[in-house]
Each structure stands twice: as C-alpha cells, then as structure tokens.
Regions:
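Metal-dependent phosphoester/phosphodiester hydrolase catalytic core
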Residues: 1-64, 68-586
Length: 586
C-alpha cells in the first residue's frame, strides 16, 4: 500500500541569512522517503529513494504551473528525507535547498514519489515558501498563546471564534494580502489536561477513564491525538503549511502547573502514571514542536536527531533523551534563537529550565541564563530589535506581581512553616508561578534588558512577547536613572482560542488599579518580600477575547496591532482593537 500523509505539512524554518533554505515537517502513515518539490521540478529529481537528505535539481517555477519559468524563479529548489520512527509513527523534517531570495515558491509534498500534498480538490491557495530579500527590509511577526483546538465546524463553539482559524481564513481569501512572515506560538499549543469531548470519547476506547489520569492524556499515542486534533483543522493546516512557525511549550503542553515547585514535582513522581506521562510529553514536544525550531545547521549538529535517524526505530533513543531531560533539566536546552534580518528572536524555556529549591528558586538555571545573556549580547549593533519570547509574562499587573512575590517569600519560609504550607497550596490553586514568583530571575532579566538597551549600539526596541494569562495588554517598564535608551515593552497576547472566567477579568483590571497597587504593596510587606528594582505602567489594554498581536519591524521602526476574532451578521473576521507605533513615544 502506498504511503499517505497523516499530518502536515508544516513550514517550520525559512533562512533569513541567504534566503535559500527552508524546512518542512510531515508525518506519514508508514516508512517512506518524503520529498518537497517546488512547482516545475521534473519528476524524480528531488528524491533519492532510501537515501538521506538531498537537495533536488531541476527547473522550478514560482506559484505557477510546471512549465512556468518566469524570471527570478528558483531553479533546483526542493529536498527529501527518509522518515524516522517514534512509537510507531513516522516523521520527516525535510530540508529544502536552492530557493531564491525575495521569491514566493509553491511546493508539493511527495511520499515515495507519489504526490500527497496538496490533496485533490483542495479549496485553499497553493502552499508557498516565501523567502526574504537579502538583506531583509523588515519582518512581520504574529504571536499569541493558549489555543484549545476548535470544535468541528458543525458544532457550536462556546468560547468564540478561533483567532488562528480566522487569520488563516482571511489569508486564504486574500492570498496576495498581508500575511505574517512568521508565527510565534508562545505555549499551550495543545492541552494535555483539558481534552475535548471528542478526544475523551476516543480515550475511552483505549482505557478506563475512571482510573488516573482519567480524561487527561497518558502516553505518546494520546499526545499525538492532540496534535492531530489541532493541526488537521483544514484552514489551520493550510496556514501552517505556508507560514513559518517558532514554538515553545508552557505547562498545558505537558500538564497544568508543570514544575511549579519542588514539592509538586515530588508528588507527581510518586504517582504510578506520571513517568509515562512526562516522558511522552517531552518526546511528543520534541517531535512536533522543538525539532522544527532548529535551523538546518543546528539539525546537522544535533546528537538526538542523529540518534533517532540512525536506527529503524528511534523510540528508545528519544525516550532516553526525555528521561535525561526530566531527571537533569540543566543538561538539555529547549530555548532557541531565530534571526530575521536585523531582528533577533530568543525563545526562552520558562518551564523545564527552572531551579525549584525554595532557597534558590530561579526561572532559568545558570546554564540557561548564560545562554540567554550570550545570545542577547552577541554582536552589539547587529540588530535593531530584540524579541524575547517567554510563555509567561515578565511584567504582570503590579498587584498580581506583588502577590506572587509575597507568595514566593511565604513558600521559602519568611513567615514560618505554617505560612509556607499555606503559600504552597495557594501557589498551586492560583497559578502563582510567573517571573514575579522567581524574584532573582525577574531582577536578572531586568538587568540584562537594561544592559542590552544601553549604549551607542543599543537596539531600537526590546519587546518581551508573552501569553498564558488569557488577556492582552501592553506595559512599559522604567528604571532608576539612567534609563536605557532602548524602548522596552511587555507585549502580552492570549488566548488564541480559550476563555477566561469573569472573576479573573475583574482581578486583572484590579491588578492595574491604584487600589490594587496599594493592596499588593501591603501583601509584599507582610511576606517581607523586597520591592522590584523597576516600576512599570500599563499603556494598552487589558483586552479580552480570542486574539493575536502582530509586530511590523522595519529598520528601527516598530508598529504593533492587536486583532480579535469576532462574529457578527457578516460572518467571522479579525477586528483591529488597537494599533500603535512603538518607536515614537507612548
């Protein structure tokens, strides 16, 4: 039987240094050679059956028919890769070479030489790989977090229209209109602990849901179901095939409150189902999200990628890696960097890299912080904008920041053992685990941003991109003199598709108020928590709804737009709620 396409394609990486390379991720239903062939490549030129990664050769067109050879179209663009196997699933990350800068090239996917993408009678525009001009003139980045898979079209959606679906539908209707150059997905791409009714029915065919972990996922196969449910949504499938993406996990990609504290970890490790859950969560994240974050050069040097491809079944190799990552988080780095011309993006792991000893709590372990500092400070003057992608906001509403620092002080024993027990219970119930709950890390990040933003070679902006909190806002910090010359902003955008309780809306609004600030200060004094070295103010929001933010960065200019998905008598659309220039003052 011929190989079929089970999931994907996802266009994950496009090279902004030369404009010649890309990677495309797929899952097939059996072992095969997966090939990306740009339109116009002669049959058989792109793949070597049974071989490793190879560049295709042949005459290719740009968004045209096979004989389209208009000027500027890439010649010889394509590539292939043999699938690797994990837990009975078959994946490939296909390197595409030979692209031309400043081009838009339609592509198809073949498995063992048979075309499987796009499907027959596919209603959406061609999947294309768009490459930047070299040097790049600018970049448009759309970002958000927290996407619960939309229900099938025939079902009512109680949490409103999906912002990613709505963006995809708009792009499909206007293929030559505005589109992001990259999607930055800041965590909770799937919800392992909050499964849909349809997934729960499927889980019930596999095991008894009255036994732990109940209606949550339990193993690798069940994690793959979440990605299928999320990424097989037809219009989102098309979107991910044509817009590159960077991803980082948050807790729900594995389990709610993941790594919130040392006592939480100890309790989870005592549960008989936990080891399979955490290893499967890390394995599925590596396959579906992390691998595509890496450049072709990084992939070539990655020992885990080499190990899983060196054997007919890479499950044991990847499982061993996941076990090491769980036992010794400092031995693994999930954080990664992408450069988009003169914009540098650093995606920061704020879940697995934590130090949980109450007396030495840190959001990032020493090695992770050294990596972050090194990447942020490398080659001063070589970038105009620094984007720090962290699933958890650095700057929260001030009252909530103070409550989290108060809670952290209680948990480390500042008010005695009884208050420490109260603090731990509250930490878990209220999700008090953002940067504010790691005071030394909060200050260290503030210090790094100030260092980056000072001096004659400082970038125009440093933007901290975050999600998690199911609303959106813009906040701006202020340091004691001297202030950095760079404009620094916290840009929080969440959810893409989820809900927030009315009580939480009230709480977040209160957190920004003067009364809220006074309440927070009182709590911090009770916990004997120190005051932060910076202050900050909200300059936009809060906005509640399913939404995406888009940054347009061109030269040293930066513009921000917030779009919400809304439904009215005319249908579902993206409504712009806020639009501002970030480099001409507040």
């Amino acid at each position: 039987m011929a190989a079929g396409l089970r999931l994907g394609p996802l266009l994950r990486y496009v090279d902004w240094e030369t404009g010649e390379h890309a990677t495309v991720w797929i899952e097939a239903d059996r072992p095969c050679t997966a090939e990306v062939r740009c339109l116009g490549a002669p049959p058989g030129e792109g793949a070597v059956p049974g071989g490793g990664d190879t560049a295709a050769s042949g005459v290719l067109g740009t968004e045209g028919s096979p004989d389209d050879s208009r000027a500027g179209s890439p010649k010889g663009a394509g590539g292939s890769s043999r699938t690797f196997q994990i837990e009975g699933h078959h994946y490939a990350l296909i390197p595409v070479s030979g692209l031309t800068p400043a081009s838009s090239t339609a592509y198809e996917v073949l498995l063992d030489g048979r075309r499987v993408w796009p499907p027959a009678e596919w209603p959406y525009p061609p999947s294309v790989i768009r490459t930047p001009a070299i040097p790049a003139e600018g970049v448009r980045v759309s970002f958000g977090s927290c996407r619960w898979a939309a229900p099938p079209a025939r079902e009512h959606d109680p949490i409103g229209p999906d912002a990613l679906d709505t963006l995809a539908a708009r792009m499909a209707a206007e293929p030559e209109g505005e589109r992001p150059d990259v999607l930055v997905l800041l965590g909770d791409q799937v919800y392992a602990d909050a499964t849909s009714r349809e997934t729960q029915r499927w889980l019930a065919t596999r095991r008894d849901l009255s036994e732990p972990p109940g209606a949550e996922v339990a193993d690798y196969e069940e994690y793959t179901r979440l990605y299928e449910e999320s990424w097989l949504d037809p219009v989102v499938r098309w979107l991910l095939s044509t817009v590159p993406s960077c991803m980082i996990f948050d807790d729900h990609d594995v389990i709610d409150d993941w790594n919130t504290s040392a006592s939480w970890v100890a309790e989870m490790r005592a549960k008989p189902w936990w080891r399979e859950r955490i290893l499967s969560g890390l394995m599925s994240y590596w396959v579906h999200q992390h691998l595509g974050n890496l450049s072709p050069a990084e992939l070539a040097d990655d020992p885990v990628y080499a190990a899983v491809r060196a054997t007919p079944d890479g499950t044991d190799a990847l499982r061993s890696f996941a076990a090491r990552a769980d036992a010794d988080p400092a031995s693994v780095r999930w954080s990664h960097r992408r450069d988009f011309g003169r914009t540098r993006l650093l995606m920061i792991d704020t879940r697995a890299a934590r130090v949980l000893d109450e007396r030495h709590r840190a959001m990032l372990d020493d090695e992770e912080m050294r990596w972050l500092r090194g990447q942020a400070l490398e080659a001063p003057g070589s970038y105009d904008h620094l984007l720090l992608g962290t699933s958890l906001p650095w700057l929260l509403p001030p009252a909530i920041h103070d409550v989290e620092s108060w809670n952290a002080a209680l948990c480390r024993g500042e008010r005695g053992e009884r208050w420490a027990r109260v603090g731990e219970d509250l930490r878990r119930r209220a999700d008090l685990e953002h940067w504010a709950a790691f005071p030394s890390s909060f200050e260290e990040l503030a210090s790094l941003i100030r260092e980056v933003g000072s001096g004659p070679l400082a970038p125009s902006t440093v933007c901290v991109l975050s999600g998690d909190v199911h609303h959106a806002y813009v906040a701006e910090p202020h340091w004691p003199d001297p202030e950095p010359s760079t404009r620094v902003l916290q840009l929080t955008c969440s959810p893409v598709h989820n809900a927030i309780h009315a009580s939480m809306r009230v709480g977040f609004r209160f957190g920004w108020s003067r009364l809220g600030r006074r309440f927070g200060h009182a709590m911090a004094r009770h916990g004997r928590a120190g005051r932060p070295v910076i202050r900050w103010d909200k300059t936009g929001g809060p906005w509640f709804g399913n939404q995406l933010m888009t940054l347009t960065l061109n030269g040293r200019s930066a513009d921000l737009r917030l779009d919400q998905a809304v439904t009215d008598r005319t249908g579902t659309r993206l409504l712009t709620m806020d639009e501002r220039n970030l480099t001409d003052g507040p």
